[in-house]
Curated annotation (Swiss-Prot):
GO terms for cellular component: cytoplasm. Pfam families: SurE (PF01975). This is 5'-nucleotidase SurE. It catalyses: a ribonucleoside 5'-phosphate + H2O = a ribonucleoside + phosphate. Binds 1 divalent metal cation per subunit.
């Protein structure tokens, strides 16, 4: 089996090294990732300039583009490697709740899913770098189960690993997405020339972390698996919307 691996933290990140190393024990691996950190770019494509594909000394390929670009190139350029699965991550920091809409890590998996390829996004609920051992041990458990009976139809799973010591992981839970409040205000500043600039403010606090959500369960020490879908249609609102637009 062939697994194409990407991320949004860049090809030099610790997370993608862990993901590639463990996955290589179960399948053939090819890494195609952004050349630099592209966190928060979501499903964006690079359309205003050409892309370049280069190979690093460790064998990983990198692209001067987005995670979505990487999936397109990974599936189009290599005649000797067509992915059976796409793994994205391991992201340095969680991708839970509505964060998934902004995540380039989740976007890479989403793009693969749109191509008909089963895809999984992996994230670690920690940005300090302290819990990579937990992520690696959890990944061994997850992939051993995954490859024992691989999915036969396209799936899109978002997996978050808790920020606890390896022995304190409590198991796996299937969880729905939680919610955050909207992000905090932009931060005004001045550049060295005295010109007005702005920084995007911090993320909002979590507003829905009850039992059964990814925020709640991962925060309680569980690995969370959330099945995602692409269809954004609000089906419960179809009748009300029709009544509004068809009213006399």
């Amino acid at each position: 089996m062939n697994v194409l691996i990407s991320n949004d933290d860049g090809y030099l990140s610790e997370g993608i090294a862990v993901l590639a190393r463990v996955t290589a024990e179960f399948a053939n691996v090819r890494v195609v990732a952004p050349e630099r950190d592209r966190s928060g770019v979501s499903n964006s494509l690079t359309l205003e300039r050409p892309l370049q594909l280069k190979q690093a000394q460790n064998g990983f390929y990198y692209v001067n583009g987005t995670p979505t670009d990487c999936i397109h190139i990974g599936q189009s350029v290599f005649s000797d490697f067509q992915a059976d699965f796409v793994f994205s991550g391991i992201n340095r920091g969680a991708n839970m709740g509505d964060d998934t809409l902004y995540s380039g890590t989740v976007a890479a998996a989403t793009e693969a899913y749109l191509m008909g390829i089963p895809a999984v996004a992996f994230s670690l609920n920690d940005a300090s770098g302290r819990y990579w051992a937990t992520a690696e041990k959890a990944l061994w458990t997850l992939l051993a189960h995954f490859f024992k009976n691989p999915p036969q139809s396209p799936i899109l799973w978002n997996i978050n690993i808790p920020a606890v010591e390896p022995e304190d992981v409590r198991g796996i839970k299937i969880a729905r997405l939680g919610r955050r409040h909207h992000g905090q205000n932009v931060i005004p500043a001045r550049n060295p020339r005295g010109e007005q600039i702005y920084w995007i403010g911090p993320v909002g606090r979590v507003s829905d972390k009850e039992e059964g959500t990814d925020f709640g369960e991962c925060g309680a020490g569980f690995i969370t698996v959330t099945p995602l879908q692409i269809d954004l249609t609000a089906y419960p609102d179809m009748a009300e919307t029709a009544a509004f637009w068809h009213a006399d």
